[in-house]
Amino acid sequence: MDSVSFEDVAVAFTQEEWALLDPSQKNLYRDVMQEIFRNLASVGNKSEDQNIQDDFKNPGRNLSSHVVERLFEIKEGSQYGETFSQDSNLNLNKKVSTGVKPCECSVCGKVFICHSALHRHILSHIGNKLFECEECPEKLYHCKQCGKAFISLTSVDRHMVTHTSNGPYKGPVYEKPFDFPSVFQMPQSTYTGEKTYKCKHCDKAFNYSSYLREHERTHTGEKPYACKKCGKSFTFSSSLRQHERSHTGEKPYECKECGKAFSRSTYLGIHERTHTGEKPYECIKCGKAFRCSRVLRVHERTHSGEKPYECKQCGKAFKYSSNLCEHERTHTGVKPYGCKECGKSFTSSSALRSHERTHTGEKPYECKKCGKAFSCSSSLRKHERAYMW
């Protein structure tokens, strides 16, 4: 009677892949492996006393990849502890209905009833070549097509897909086809729509406990990710990575049209609309359209009269955060904008620009009635009121 173990269906990372993961992604990996383990346990021998929560305090124990096990031991030993023993493998009776589809070889198309049998078959394609690991005496499998080495048949199977054009690999647990290496990024609850992890503070629910933990920080105010340069803290690791680019100057997202680069992909997306002319965000009051949702929200305040930015010193409210910042300088006395001609300083950049026109003689604001020009818009408005009386 054939059986399938947790190792047969768990996905493994190479050392290089694992090093690229940040803490939140490692937490997600742990959650996905826990989901798979739970699904297998639910159809296995009910008498087996498997303490899943205790097992997953040490996620390295369930990794089939030898290289990743060593990473957990060496890099994160103090956090995760020892690796799993073989006793944690869960043997399942194949006659129990698991919904597993037959496993097909991506090289020759031969079909097998279980993933472990497919692994053994894969050896016929790679030549079953072994050599010693440089880190320890473990034996590694060697691909005869490209020479790459792997410790587990799971990794070999995944790797062989890169040498074929037969399309995506069909995962051993779920019916939906996947392209490695993301085969187990989403557990079954993703496809059923089930969201089992519910927030205690609001009605939101999530597929993964790691997503719930991140969301709960929006309620608690916890910001565990701190910038090493300036000390600023963030709720999410992705926000920290984006912030760090403000120190490094890194701008990895480049416009193909003009070559302008941006620190965030969202900024690039907004910029690209300057080339396409796309303005997908439309005001329902007046029909005016905008390139990004933020500008639309700011515009909508001209209709609603909303002034969400309030001064803590005097209570005066403003439509825009920039106006609040300028106003607060009237309390602090800070004048960061200095004139290069005479050295006079101002609280806002607009006030500086108006002042600079006294040096250049520029008068861009012209009265439509009489043609008289002014250096600042406020002077033009005062002049226009004279016609109203």
UniProtKB/Swiss-Prot annotation:
It comes from the Eukaryota. Residues 4-90 form the KRAB domain. Gene3D superfamilies: 6.10.140.140, Classic Zinc Finger. The modification Phosphotyrosine is found at Y281. A zinc finger (C2H2-type) spans 103-125, 141-163, 197-219, 225-247, 253-275, 281-303, 309-331, 337-359, 365-387. Keywords: DNA-binding, Metal-binding, Nucleus, Phosphoprotein, Repeat, Transcription, Transcription regulation, Zinc, Zinc-finger. One of its GO terms (molecular function) is zinc ion binding. One of its GO terms (biological process) is regulation of transcription by RNA polymerase II. It is found in: Nucleus. GO terms for cellular component: nucleus. Pfam families: KRAB (PF01352), zf-C2H2 (PF00096), zf-H2C2_2 (PF13465). May be involved in transcriptional regulation. Belongs to the krueppel C2H2-type zinc-finger protein family. This is Zinc finger protein 670. The lineage of its organism: Eukaryota, Metazoa, Chordata, Craniata, Vertebrata. The gene is ZNF670.
